[in-house]
A protein has these predicted regions:
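Carbohydrate-associated surface elements
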Residues: 115-116, 162, 178-192, 205-206, ...
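Hydrophobic alpha-helical segments
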Residues: 2, 8-9, 16, 121-125, ...
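Short, contiguous, pocket-lining structural segments
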Residues: 45-59, 86, 176, 180, ...
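Active-site-proximal alpha-helical scaffolds that flank and shape metal-associated catalytic sites
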Residues: 5, 51, 75-176, 207
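Acidic, carboxylate-rich catalytic segments that either coordinate divalent cations
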Residues: 198-227
Length: 227
């Protein structure tokens, strides 16, 4: 009898998901994420995510703008523009809401130092988007896929007692957010660039996601007490 080999997904985005599965599993098992799931994550630790992800999203918006300019068709250019509006008007607004709920003043949110890991992750995405459209897409997709994957997994567990963490899970498992990520993956499928190169970028993107969680978990002392 011939051996039964695992089926190779037809879609590039699914092949790259499969390739990055061990890193995504590590993200789900990370103590920062598990703390959200259980509701036991100290508020001061979660506040790091609120601030650093706020700053990360500022550069993320720039990368969306680059993709909106360099996409090969009008439809894709329009969709990336819509992604920018969604990020600016909804996701950043949600961060403002979380900041208030975690006692982070607006001045602290806007003026807090951007940590080295946040800067490095953002620089990676900017660099890839400047190199080519396909690389920019491959660098950006892992972030959205990562949040949807984590939130869906956490939503399948018992809800955390802390409503703030339950709301975080609801936000990133929301169908509207998932639909936006689905479109991003479909655009990755359509990119006319060499898949091996895109796979390297994609894997690096997932690695940066894992590093970001670890970066937040380790933290920098007295982040909100500087100056």
């Amino acid at each position: 009898m011939w051996p039964l080999w695992p089926a190779v997904p037809e879609r590039r985005s699914q092949r790259l998901r499969q390739l990055a599965a061990p890193q995504r599993a590590a993200c789900l098992a990370h103590p920062f994420v598990r703390g959200i799931a259980s509701g036991s994550l100290p508020a001061a630790v979660f506040a790091r995510w609120v601030v650093q992800d706020w700053h990360y999203l500022q550069t993320y918006l720039q990368v969306l703008g680059t993709l909106a300019r360099t996409a090969p068709c009008a439809h894709a250019r329009q969709r990336w523009g819509q992604m920018a509006v969604l990020t600016r008007d909804e996701e950043l607004d949600l961060h403002r809401s979380f900041a208030q709920r975690f006692d982070i003043a607006p001045a602290q949110l806007a003026g807090a130092a951007v940590w080295p890991g946040t800067l490095a992750y953002s620089a990676f995405q900017v660099e890839q988007a400047n190199r080519s459209y396909g690389r920019g897409v491959a660098a950006l997709v892992p972030c959205g896929v990562g949040y949807v994957t984590l939130a869906r997994a956490l939503a399948a567990e018992s809800a955390p007692a802390d409503d703030r963490y339950a709301d975080w899970i609801r936000m990133y498992s929301d169908p509207a957010f998932a639909q936006a990520v689905d479109w991003m993956e479909s655009e990755l499928d359509r990119v006319d660039e060499e898949e091996d190169a895109l796979a390297v970028v994609y894997r690096n993107g997932v690695t940066w996601e894992l590093r970001f969680w670890e970066h937040l978990w380790q933290g920098i002392p007295d982040e909100f007490n500087r100056g």
